[in-house]
Amino acid sequence: MKFLSEDFLLTNESAKMLFHKHAEKMPIIDYHCHLEPAEIYENKKYENLTQIWLGGDHYKWRLLRANGIPEKLITGDGEDYEKFLAFAKTLEKSFGNPIYEWTHLELKRFFHIDKLISSETAKEIWDEANQMLATDDFRPRALIKNSQVKVVCTTDDPVSTLSYHKLLAKEEKDFKVLPALRPDHLISITDGHFADYLTELSAVSGIEIKGFKTMIKALEQRFEFFTSLGGRLSDHSLSTYTFAETKNVDLDSILQKAKENQTLTDLEYNQYITALILEIMKLNKKFEWTMQLHVNVNRSINGPALSKIGENTGFDSMGTQANISEELTKLFSKAAELETIPKTILYSLNQNDWLELVTMIGCFQGEGVQQLQLGAGWWFNDTKKGMENQLEIFASQSLLSNFVGMLTDSRSFLSYPRHEYFRRVLCNFVGQLIENGRIPDNEALVGKMIEDISYNNVHDYFGFFKDEDSNQ
């Protein structure tokens, strides 16, 4: 088969029919990403491929380091073309890595350049693409609109003023840019900055934070504020998690110790985190939001690199907490007692957790369609095999037809072909079920499922268009 042909990843006739007739045409809702709302609003123009393709993309940075490229040409002050050339040389060696496929798919879809990226073609592609980047069609808003994206959910700190979301809500009519609340600084209370952060949270919420309860009250005010601008999700990273009972625990004392940078015991930290997540679950349910939990990841494990380059620069790895599903089961059991389980999407970076998690959440499904979901293959699992494994586990233990599908989790405006990649994998997976006689060869029935997973489910699940839909 020709590289990136029209039937790329589609290995049977049913798959080809499902993709070309049902998945390919569907719009996109990107409900979790790391795009900067300021860049969307300002509609900045990128000068060259390095700026739009390599800036902030730690997926690519890891490959460059594996190829011995000096840091100057990765995150340093090297010339932009030299950085791109280093990437082209690295890409030549990346067969089998999804970045090879994504990068060429992006080049083909956005720039209509059907050439292999290599050290030999780098200058030609650089010049051709940079000419196009100078046009308005390659500004962020045009890239979003032309990718048929209807909603972009950014990742935002509770203390954010959401000023660019406000401006975009007034001025942008082709798509929505909505905030998603991520309170990392309320979880990382041992980093030495907790007291300063509580001061910020108090100021922006207008609530004096005297202890744990008033901190939650301030957080609730931010939920209200985010909701007023279309917010419907919260997102939480728990690298590890250990449940701890919180009854009769002096949470104010733990909070005070953290503010004073005193060392917390493991038990105190676990009590605080459990109490915090339980309150966050309650707030998500109150505001009819969806809670996302990203678990079992080792972040910034290279200490010298963290000190020199910073966080989110490619020094993270899969976590190995073997009992994390058991600990999350205790959390959900407690929330069930309190009747505060919200709609939830669980992502684990360790595939060994997936079967445990999907069977666990099956014990806590509430009223409504698929309230609890196993999230799409995340980060290092954002591969053909990772996607297939997640689909197979979800289908075997729950209702695949209810799955809310793909997200980019990206910092790049050129990442939307990842939705196409996922849809091709999905159609091939389902097509194989048809070919094997495991599900009916019924286009109307199965085609609807493909369209639902591609777009309709996520449209209905999060309620981004609830007001518009109710007026129709």
From Swiss-Prot:
Please indicate if the UniProt record lists Isomerase as a keyword: yes
Q: Which UniProt keywords are listed? A: Isomerase
Catalytic activity from the UniProt record: D-glucuronate = D-fructuronate; aldehydo-D-galacturonate = keto-D-tagaturonate
Statement: the UniProt record of this protein carries the keyword Transferase: no
Please name the GO terms of the biological process aspect recorded for this protein, alphabetically: D-galacturonate catabolic process; D-glucuronate catabolic process
Pathway annotation from the record: Carbohydrate metabolism; pentose and glucuronate interconversion
Cite the EC number: 5.3.1.12
The record's GO molecular-function terms, alphabetically, read: glucuronate isomerase activity
Superkingdom as given in the UniProt entry: Bacteria
Which Pfam families does the UniProt entry name for this protein?
UxaC
Q: Please state which protein family the record places this protein in.
A: Belongs to the metallo-dependent hydrolases superfamily. Uronate isomerase family.
Name the chain's protein: Uronate isomerase
Gene that this polypeptide is encoded by: uxaC
